[in-house]
Amino acid sequence: MEIWDAYYLDGTLAGSILVRGKPIPEGLYHLVSEILVRHTDGEYLLMQRDPRKPNYGGYFEATAGGSALKGEDAYCCAKRELREETGINAGTLTNIGRFLSHDTIYETFLCVTDCDKNSVTLQEGETVSYKWISEAEFIDFVNSDAMIDVQFQRYLPHLKQMGYIK
């Protein structure tokens, strides 16, 4: 059973818990961290979702991420999820945005890493492949139908700031 802290809309702790799979009460939210990974050489990491996943199975996504566990803030969640889903140990993460959707608060981060590109690991049931793509290929990716739309919306402020939107 996965236990989460409940949050108010403004991101403050509500003092109650939520359980994955159970309805989230009106006025409460759960916290999700997402991480965009860029190598110091300018390439971006894309992870291919397991085809068995119910949502967007088989799609490549420009993220690692997931729900914050009870007692975990967005930053700690991002570091844990990145390590679990890619094997990358982030030094510093930069918060690049906040997005609200239904009963979820998304905190998005950028990880700039100099990791060995061949050391990326896959998480059973989550991902089946990965690839590093150039900045030009990443710009094409975010401006195409290949990028998961809800993920695009969450990264949009950062993508605009970087001049990546055509």
Which residues does each PLM region occupy?
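Nudix hydrolase/Nudix homology domain
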Residues: G21, G58, S101-K117, T121-K166
